């Protein structure tokens, strides 16, 4: 028994000290906030917003131990000129979030991109905050800026 106890203790400590992306997998229920823009020039900022209840789901990718963000967000297009909040047109956002969940929660966030749409996800315990942002070019494309068009706050 004296020989087994230290081995068992080391095994338990190894399992508890090493976190993986699996700890963030699951369904988060919360509120989507859709920002509205008065003109096609979204750099002027949002004029109002709508909120709707919804869910975001994170699935584990067994090949890379990453997370798939699987979420249904009404985005009629990836261009702000055609973006209408709550338009009813659904795009599925399947993103592989690879840089989440290293040992001891050193990292608990990731940003991934689809074309000029960026998704930033931050986990905090059983809570998640996600932002969908549109990248716009400024000064002839020399500089870029990101404008938030959708936010999500939820808990597991």
Residue ranges and their predicted role:
Residues 1-18:
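Sec-dependent bacterial lipoprotein signal peptides
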Residues 25-68, 111-118:
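Short, solvent-exposed loop/hinge segments that bridge or flank secondary-structure elements
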Residues 33-36, 70-77, 133-139:
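Short, solvent-exposed aromatic-acidic interface loops
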Residues 35-43, 106-108, 135-145:
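Flexible, membrane-facing loop/turn or short amphipathic-helix motifs
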Residues 58-125, 155-156:
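Contiguous, well-ordered beta-strand patches that form the walls/edges
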Residues 125-156:
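Edge beta-strand at a domain terminus
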Residues 17-31, 122-125, 156:
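N-terminal helix-cap/turn-to-beta initiation motif at the start of protein domains
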């Amino acid at each position: 028994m004296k020989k087994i106890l230290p081995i068992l203790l080391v095994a338990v400590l190894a399992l508890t000290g090493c976190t993986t992306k699996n700890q963030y997998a699951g369904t988060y229920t919360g509120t989507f906030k859709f920002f509205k823009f008065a003109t096609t020039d979204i750099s002027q900022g949002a004029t109002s917003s709508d909120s709707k209840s919804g869910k975001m789901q994170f699935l584990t990718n067994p090949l890379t131990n990453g997370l798939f963000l699987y979420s249904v967000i009404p985005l009629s297009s990836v261009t702000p000129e055609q973006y209408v909040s709550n338009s009813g047109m659904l795009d599925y956002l399947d993103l592989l979030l690879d840089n989440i969940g290293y040992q001891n929660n050193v990292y608990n966030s990731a940003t991934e991109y689809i074309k000029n749409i960026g998704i930033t996800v931050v986990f905090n315990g059983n809570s998640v905050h996600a932002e969908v942002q549109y990248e716009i070019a400024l000064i002839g494309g020399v500089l870029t800026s990101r404008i938030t068009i959708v936010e999500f706050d939820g808990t597991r």
